[in-house]
Structure formats: C-alpha cells, structure tokens
C-alpha cells in the first residue's frame, strides 16, 4: 500500500456547535474530528467498501490527546491523521491539529478491526486493501 494512502488531511473551521462553555472547541469535538479523518482515510483507500462487504467494524481501543492551544469560534484549522505502524493485532495512528502554522493539539490512537471471527489481523487488512487498489478480487472470509 502506498505510504501517502495512510494519511488523511482535512481543513476545517470551528463552528458554534463545536464550542464549550469557555467558547473554544470542546475536547470531545477534537475526538469527533479524529473520527472524521479516519472515515476519510477509509473512503480514499477503499477500506470502507471492504469493511461493509466483509462486515468488519473499526473499534478504537485507546485514544489520547494533548491540548496545547484553544481553537476559537470560526478559526480555521487542519487535522492530519497518519497510520504510523501496525502489529499482529493493532493499528497505531497519530493525529495533529494545526492552526496558523502552530500545533494546537496532538494525539495517538490504537484501533482494531473486528470481524465475525474476532480481531482481523492488520496484515490481512493491508493485503485486502492493496488487492482492491490493484483491481484484484479479494474473496469473502
């Protein structure tokens, strides 16, 4: 799989429904935006279609965020998410929020894909996505 395919970058703006009582972006909204970046990656790599076909469900098992600066109403920001590595069970990703050239938040997440038989090994997922990108049929398992 191409390395650039493992990164999602989205440009966003803080909306009024993103705010907390302190009038900056709510910490929970940062996590929701991380979810949006994952969905973007799933769509662009073809993984979403495979997940639907194979009945695989993405599960975040751990997510940490460090908040460095607040994001104010209507402020523009960019969120980048990269899958940095995987092992026999988990995918590991980093998330970075930038505004005006400065890091405002960053975090890491650990995820699995669950199938009918339990956790789908990342190697199997990568193989299936690569085959799909190359136009090769992948059998349903």
Residue ranges and their predicted role:
Residues 71-78, 82-141:
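HotDog/MaoC-like acyl-thioester-processing domains
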């Amino acid at each position: 799989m191409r390395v650039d395919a493992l990164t999602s970058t989205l440009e966003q703006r803080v909306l009024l429904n993103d705010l907390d009582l302190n009038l900056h972006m709510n910490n929970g909204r940062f996590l929701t935006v991380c979810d949006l970046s994952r969905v973007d990656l799933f769509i662009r790599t073809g993984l979403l279609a495979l997940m639907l076909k194979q009945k695989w469900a993405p599960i975040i098992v751990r997510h940490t965020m460090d908040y460095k600066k607040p994001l104010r109403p209507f402020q523009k920001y960019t969120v980048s998410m990269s899958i940095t590595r995987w092992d026999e069970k988990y995918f590991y990703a980093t998330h970075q929020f930038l505004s005006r050239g400065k890091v405002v938040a960053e975090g890491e997440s650990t995820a699995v894909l669950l199938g009918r038989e339990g956790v789908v090994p990342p190697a199997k997922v990568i193989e299936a996505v690569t085959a799909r990108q190359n136009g090769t049929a992948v059998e349903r398992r």
